[in-house]
Regions:
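Bacterial N-terminal signal peptides that target proteins for export
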Residues: 2-11
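Cysteine-centered motifs
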Residues: 16-17
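C-terminal motif of bacterial Sec signal peptides marking the signal peptidase cleavage site
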Residues: 23-24
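Accessory carbohydrate-recognition regions in carbohydrate-active enzymes
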Residues: 31-360
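A short, hydrophobic C-terminal helix/tail in secreted or cell-surface proteins
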Residues: 361-365
Length: 365
């Protein structure tokens, strides 16, 4: 077959559309525009698997993520179901639990992955400091989720975390992300963040500070010594800086910091090993301070919630410095409602995909 005049951006549409997107596209190409919206044809679940058993092959898996992002966006707010293994996007459709929502993801790449930084999870009940394992052999704060409620579309993701009765939703701007959590009634609801978490390894060192009763900021330094791209062979060396706000006051917050020995390997499989998880699970909770730095740290803010009360976390990201993260936050997402962010993300996709659509030429032979 021969194709003419199909720009690169259309490849995304073809990959993400049901039935390759050709049915909907050809209808409008004949002049019947109707209420056509290109974003309606995007299916982020296409390719969202790392399962060799489901695919029947070892190579050629999709390894995409279903979470929210914008065209060419630096931020991808997506569910993560697994940390170790051959798992570049952090998510695989057949997994039955979610361990959190990260703000950076790789998509469609081979080899062992990277990113998956700033892992945020809403929880209730007693605090747990590890996600545990997807196979259930080690428990933690990860939650089963209802596949029937899992929804993904251009610039938006949602799922019901059934272990907690919490609905989680995500959307994004080019340099920021937003999470909306709808909680059940309870006195021990929380948002917790694993700053060490990284797909295929861990951040080598992390830092977080409480700026005020709504704001946190910090960074995660990731190097080849602690895994990541190609389990360290890819020589990925980067720092993710963040500036985040929670709309519910942080009046009861704390940190945990695990004492990781100097001689411990902290790569792809080691960070989900029994000794490593036990060490993190035993980390002491620290309160009464406003900042902490270490090799494996976490943060939580705890509060009471009414039935169906919504709590929002917004975060700006930078790969340059903390000031850049703050500026991105203030320029793109400060004070914006979740629905506004999701609507604007969808509009960005419609605008980008419409450009590709107008240049679409179907196969000539």
């Amino acid at each position: 077959m021969h194709y003419r005049n199909i720009p690169k951006t259309l490849l995304f549409l073809l990959l993400c559309c049901p039935s390759m997107g050709l049915t909907g596209c050809s209808t409008t190409a004949q002049g019947d525009t109707g209420s056509f919206s290109p974003a309606d044809y995007v299916n982020p679940f296409i390719g969202a698997s790392t399962s060799t058993s489901a695919a029947g092959v070892y190579h050629g898996l999709g390894k995409t993520f279903p979470g929210a992002t914008t065209p060419y966006g630096m931020v991808q707010v997506s569910p993560n179901t697994i940390t170790g293994g051959d798992n570049s996007p952090g998510y695989s459709y057949e997994h039955t639990t979610i361990e959190g929502f990260a703000f950076t993801q790789m998509s469609g790449v081979g080899w062992f992955g990277d990113l998956g930084n700033l892992l945020v999870m809403p929880t209730t009940g007693p605090l747990q400091k590890i996600a545990g394992r997807e196979d259930g052999s080690i428990g933690g704060y990860r939650s089963h989720y209802d596949k029937a409620t899992e929804t993904a579309r251009a610039g938006y993701y949602s799922a019901l975390l059934t272990d907690y009765g919490i609905r989680a939703e995500s959307s994004a701007t080019p340099h920021c992300g937003i999470l909306r959590f709808t909680f059940p009634e309870g006195e021990q609801s929380r948002i917790q963040i694993d700053l060490a978490r990284r797909v295929g390894g861990t951040a080598e060192r992390q830092y977080i500070e409480v700026v005020d009763k709504h704001t946190i900021a910090g960074w995660m330094k990731c190097t080849p010594a602690t895994g990541g791209w190609g389990n360290g062979e890819g020589q990925a060396d980067y720092t993710v800086y963040f500036y985040a706000q929670v709309d519910k006051p942080m009046e009861n917050y704390g940190f945990w910091r695990a004492d990781i020995p100097d001689d411990w390997v902290r790569k792809r499989d080691e960070v989900v090993s029994v000794p490593y998880l036990q060490r993190v699970a035993a980390a002491p909770v620290v309160t009464g301070i406003d900042r902490i730095e270490g090799r494996h740290i976490g943060f939580y803010t705890e509060f009471g919630t009414r039935q169906d009360e919504q709590v929002i976390l917004r975060a700006g990201i930078s790969f340059v410095d903390m000031e850049g993260a703050r500026k991105n936050f203030e320029a793109e997402i400060a004070g914006k409602a979740f629905d506004q962010v999701a609507r604007e993300a969808r509009e960005l996709w419609n605008r980008e995909l419409a450009v590709s659509y107008t240049h679409l030429t179907l196969p000539t032979t």
